[in-house]
Curated annotation (Swiss-Prot):
Organism name: Alternaria alternata
Region described as AMP-binding: 473-551
Binding locations of AMP: 196-207
EC number assigned by the record: 6.2.1.-
Pathway stated in the Swiss-Prot or TrEMBL entry: Mycotoxin biosynthesis
Protein's name in the database: Acyl-CoA synthetase ALT10
Miscellaneous field: Gene clusters encoding host-selective toxins (HSTs) are localized on conditionally dispensable chromosomes (CDCs), also called supernumerary chromosomes, where they are present in multiple copies. The CDCs are not essential for saprophytic growth but controls host-selective pathogenicity.
Family: Belongs to the ATP-dependent AMP-binding enzyme family.
Length: 566
């Protein structure tokens, strides 16, 4: 192992950098704040010492329950500086959800904002987390703003441990932990655990993932190179920083390319005005958020002048949305990655003249990532085992290939991939092949051009009489109908074919069911797809539900249909 190489600690030269690192736009109750790199390093150093004072040391798990903002950025960087593992959590979770997560991860410290006085009218977001933490006798530190760090702005941050008693007297008191030594920058190792996250759970129960400094840096360097990020860039972060694409794929790639991140406390209605005002050059959003942003007012119905590209990830972008965004003349880039592999390791890049070189669901394969396609050696092309049913003695029936055009499960290997799920040997056996490749659960193929093309999720692909049908292509065909607002394709049981195609559709608000029947929609889809891919059942719904990264909950819809709940 090598110390002080490839670590997520801001470089020493940043101590003298007066350029803006973070901008927090003004709100009704607070003025705009601009924090330079010099100031950010000073704040991080101060918080780093506070963490040591609180007994946080190497490999300690620190739960960060903070909304998007300066506090999150400074606390996150300081946790990594002290060789601890940062575990950002959604501040909007319920007390029950916090208890479940805290019980599994057993954090040495939980960091949150002070609860505002009732008279302030401010949101009490941390309250459920605080109740859950104290109920489990966990230590809680409140991140308060002070004026201890001064570089002209008078804004500083300092942590204070709030020694509150547990909610019930029959619980033991919160333990007092001795102080720890503050690590120097040279003490931080690239193999140290840096980030703990929980998987989205669309294909099963959420699992705990820890990524090291080097895991994250490999992914970050791919993004920085492919998007040609530099100190001249500015991004506006509207994705949650407790998601990997937010904290690593947006925030860290910005800071470690010397650029500036604009971080509003919530999605602003004047989003496009913010982009123009702050000189935003790029931003990331899931497809559903891109659709929402298109409804926000824009000056002369055009894009902000400094915008270099738009980026999308989390789920596949529908053709109609891509064409709408593309019409504004700004490159639209898609990215693909997982919590387990690091974010956006497969990402569209900008060519030399700045135009986006892309095809929908096609991604260049970076040199740092080895990709193979897993298929069955004794079954038809594209047939692959379900991870959860795979037994060790079945590996002899599988083969890996890079042959162009062969469809199978996408498997990856590289320094970006996690070491394994935490305390979950069964999940690791299912996820990793004996040769070290990680099974993504996504179906895809390597094209003759060398690009990776995604087909769909292994557990969501519909096997209709032995023919594999990706749900996204059916959804895209439905979305091209003028009356359709949202659509989710799902599998249904069928006596003849084993599985058939179901489609749940939400109509546009200005369109009634009388204007679009299931027969109309089937005919529309038939014009675009082969008859074999036309849904057998179409149901009209009031809402289509997505997970927190914008992926439609196809398995959930399938279950509800089977139970007669749609």
């Amino acid at each position: 192992m090598t110390a002080n190489v490839n670590v997520l600690v801001l470089p020493t030269h940043m101590r003298e950098n007066d350029s803006a690192a973070i901008i927090i736009p003004s709100t009704r109750s607070a003025p705009q704040k601009e924090v330079s790199y010099k100031h950010l390093v000073a704040i991080t150093d101060s918080l780093h010492r506070d963490l040591a004072h609180l007994g946080i040391t190497k490999a300690c798990k620190v739960a960060i329950v903070l909304p998007n903002g300066l506090e999150f950025v400074a606390v996150f960087l300081s946790v990594l500086r002290q060789r601890a593992v940062a575990a950002p959590l959604d501040a909007q979770l319920t007390e029950s959800e916090f208890k479940d997560i805290f019980s599994r991860m057993k954090p040495e410290l939980v960091i949150m904002l002070p609860i505002p006085p009732e008279s302030s009218g401010g949101p009490c977001l941390p309250a459920p987390a605080m109740r859950a933490a104290l109920g489990l006798t966990l230590r809680v530190a409140l991140c308060r703003r002070t004026s201890d760090v001064k570089d002209g702005s008078g804004l500083g941050l300092q942590l204070a441990l709030d020694l509150l008693e547990p909610a019930h007297s029959n619980h033991p008191a919160v333990a007092i932990v001795p102080k720890a030594s503050a690590y120097s920058r040279d003490d931080v190792w690239s193999e140290d655990g840096a980030l703990m996250l929980f998987t989205s759970g669309t294909t099963g129960a959420p699992k705990s993932v820890v990524l090291s400094h080097i895991n994250l840096l490999v992914a970050m360097r791919i993004i920085i190179a492919n998007h040609q990020l530099s100190s001249m860039d500015r991004t506006i972060i509207i994705t949650p920083l407790h998601h990997i694409i937010g904290v690593c794929g947006s925030l860290l790639v910005t800071l470690f390319s010397g650029a500036c991140a604009v971080i509003p406390d919530s999605l602003p209605g004047a989003f496009w005005q913010y982009c123009t005002e702050f000189g935003v050059t790029w931003f990331h959003a899931v497809p559903t958020l891109h659709r929402l942003l298109l409804k926000f007012p824009r000056t002369k119905d055009s894009m902000p002048p400094r915008l270099r590209f738009l980026r999308s990830g989390g789920s596949e972008m529908a053709p109609d949305l891509y064409e709408t965004l593309k019409a504004f003349g700004v490159p639209v880039l898609e990215v693909y990655g997982m919590t387990e592999t690091g974010p956006a390791i497969f990402c569209n890049h900008l060519d030399e003249n700045g135009a986006g070189a892309r095809q929908r669901s096609h991604y260049p394969i970076p040199d740092a990532v080895d990709v193979m396609i897993l298929v069955s050696s004794d079954q038809p092309e594209g047939e692959t085992y379900d991870k959860t049913s795979l037994q060790a003695d079945q590996y002899s029936n599988l083969k890996m290939t890079k042959e162009p055009g062969v469809i199978g499960e996408v498997c990856v290997r590289g320094k970006n991939v996690m070491a394994g799920y935490i305390n979950n040997s069964r999940a690791n056996t299912e996820a990793f092949l004996p040769n070290g490749y990680f099974r993504t659960g996504d179906l895809g193929t390597i094209q003759s051009s060398g690009q990776l093309k995604l087909v769909g999720r292994l557990k969501e692909v519909i096997n209709k009489g032995g023919i594999k049908i990706g749900p996204s292509e059916v959804e895209h065909a439905a979305l091209s109908h003028e009356s359709v607002s949202e659509a989710v394709c799902f599998r249904i049981a069928d006596v003849m074919y084993g599985e058939e195609i179901g489609l749940a559709v939400k109509l546009r608000s200005n369109s009634g069911k009388n204007q679009c029947t299931d027969r109309d929609l089937k005919q529309h889809i038939r014009y675009q797809l082969s008859a074999f891919k036309v849904p057998k059942e179409i149901v009209f719904v009031d809402a289509v539900h997505y997970n927190r990264t914008g992926k439609p909950l196809r398995t959930q819809v399938s279950q509800k249909f089977a139970e007669g709940l749609l």
